[in-house]
């Protein structure tokens, strides 16, 4: 997947460059509350300006399910933040198709930047410009999310070159990534996506051994594909979080009132048989009588007491996991070890985060989501080789699945 055309392989001077960015940022009362994704896109945008391109940016913002979302998911506030971060004007076009957008693009000069309206407005507005909803008032047009061929061709017709710099949607085949890439003469990856692909590839496809994967989070069902694929790649897989109790149940241990996916016990048994010696489970836990931030009780072994639930890995497990990590040269971590939101049950996640951060000479990658939030919150952001920006996309890459948004881009 790393043989894709990159931004520096393409001549962009004077060209209209369509850039699919990921500006799907959190909003509150019409204000952007976290601008990290906007900042992450700046290197690609600044490079295109320096190369004297005409820069046409677009992104989705949240899900557009009802007509009310047209107001809530407006990109105008994002344009203002981008303008501040970029230090030059960003012209916002309140349209995602039509004459207003076409005229604005045709009037552009080199080095100018425009951002057009939320691509997912095309999920509720049909090709006649009418709001299209079903009997329940839910979006029915679905032109963006179902990769409508006419919309992909239309957007492609607005530019000369397409740059996909939105890793967060790389696992989706939408009109604004796959649709454009398939209908334009030249396409490439932006700097952000290029880095993500290189880092994930280095971790999963060509790891320096020993390769240790740490998988946590609440559910086995969310990580089945990841565990399956990593069993063929990793030397060890350390399992924590709520999902560990389904594995314990598969081994016949008592799990009290802990989280259990009954329908996944057989899969857990299969993994344990396949991954003999590879899968390392916790050897103790922190348990509580309720799902609350109450003082923890440490179990003496695998079994959870009746009337209790396991909410974090225990001290012996922390030492075991540290020992398993000590010689690792490649580490990927995806999912917390316990209920990280509860102070009493955030100890395991913090300890694992610290243990990875302190490894010398290892390639360390966090697969986005809660683990990334934990590392950033603990101040370890710069101690990891890479923290992925795409939760779902990085998970699917770790499952060994092709990512449509990247596959559609031209090869070198």
From Swiss-Prot:
Coiled coil stretches, renumbered: none
Cellular localisation: Cytoplasm
Residues holding ATP: 223, 310, 341, 368-371
Keywords: ATP-binding, Cytoplasm, Glycolysis, Kinase, Nucleotide-binding, Transferase
Enzyme nomenclature, EC number: 2.7.2.3
Pathway linked to the protein: Carbohydrate degradation; glycolysis; pyruvate from D-glyceraldehyde 3-phosphate: step 2/5
InterPro entries: Phosphoglycerate_kinase (IPR001576), Phosphoglycerate_kinase_CS (IPR015911), Phosphoglycerate_kinase_N (IPR015824), Phosphoglycerate_kinase_sf (IPR036043)
Top-level taxon: Bacteria
Catalyzed reactions: (2R)-3-phosphoglycerate + ATP = (2R)-3-phospho-glyceroyl phosphate + ADP
Disulphides: none
Chief place where the protein resides: cytoplasm
Binding site for substrate: 22-24, 37, 60-63, 120, 172
GO BP annotation list: gluconeogenesis; glycolytic process; symbiont entry into host
Uppermost EC category: transferase
Family of the protein in this entry: Belongs to the phosphoglycerate kinase family.
Quaternary organization: Monomer.
Protein name: Phosphoglycerate kinase
Organism this protein belongs to: Spiroplasma citri
Native organism taxonomy: Bacteria, Bacillati, Mycoplasmatota, Mollicutes, Entomoplasmatales
């Amino acid at each position: 997947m790393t043989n894709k055309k990159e931004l520096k392989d393409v001549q962009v001077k004077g060209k209209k460059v369509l850039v699919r960015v990921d500006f799907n940022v959190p909003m509150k009362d019409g204000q952007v509350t976290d601008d990290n994704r906007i900042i992450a896109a700046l290197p690609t945008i600044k490079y295109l300006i320096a190369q004297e391109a005409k820069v046409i940016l677009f992104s989705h913002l949240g899900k557009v399910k009802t007509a009310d979302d047209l107001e809530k998911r407006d990109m105008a506030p994002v344009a203002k933040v981008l303008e501040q971060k970029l230090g030059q004007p960003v012209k916002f076009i309140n349209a995602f198709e039509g004459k207003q957008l076409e005229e604005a693009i045709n009037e552009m000069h080199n080095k100018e930047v425009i951002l057009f309206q939320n691509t997912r407005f095309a999920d509720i507005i049909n090709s006649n410009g009418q709001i299209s909803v079903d009997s329940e008032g839910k979006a029915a047009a679905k032109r963006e999310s179902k990769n409508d061929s006419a919309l992909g061709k239309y957007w492609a017709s607005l530019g000369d070159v397409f740059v996909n710099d939105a890793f967060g949607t790389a696992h989706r085949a939408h009109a604004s990534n796959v649709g454009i890439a398939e209908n334009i003469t030249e396409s490439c990856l932006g700097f952000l996506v290029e880095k993500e692909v290189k880092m994930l590839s280095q971790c999963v496809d060509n790891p320096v051994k020993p390769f240790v994967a740490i998988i946590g989070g609440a559910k086995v069902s969310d990580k089945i594909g990841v565990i399956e694929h990593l069993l063929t790649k990793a030397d060890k897989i350390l399992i924590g979080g709520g999902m560990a109790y389904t594995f314990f149940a598969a081994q016949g241990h008592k799990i009290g009132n802990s989280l259990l996916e009954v329908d996944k016990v057989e899969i857990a048994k299969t993994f344990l048989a396949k991954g003999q010696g590879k899968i390392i489970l916790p050897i103790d836990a922190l348990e509580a009588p309720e799902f609350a931030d109450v003082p923890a009780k440490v179990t003496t072994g695998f079994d959870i007491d009746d009337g209790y639930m396991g909410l974090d890995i225990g001290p012996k497990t922390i030492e075991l996991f540290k020992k398993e990590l000590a010689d690792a040269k490649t580490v990927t971590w995806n999912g917390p070890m316990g209920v990280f939101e509860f102070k009493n049950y955030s100890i395991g996640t913090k300890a694992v985060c610290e243990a990875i951060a302190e490894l010398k000479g290892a390639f360390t990658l966090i697969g986005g989501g809660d683990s990334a939030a934990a590392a950033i919150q603990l101040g370890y952001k710069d101690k990891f080789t890479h923290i992925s920006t795409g939760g779902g996309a990085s998970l699917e890459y770790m499952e060994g699945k092709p990512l449509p948004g990247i596959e559609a881009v031209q090869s070198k």
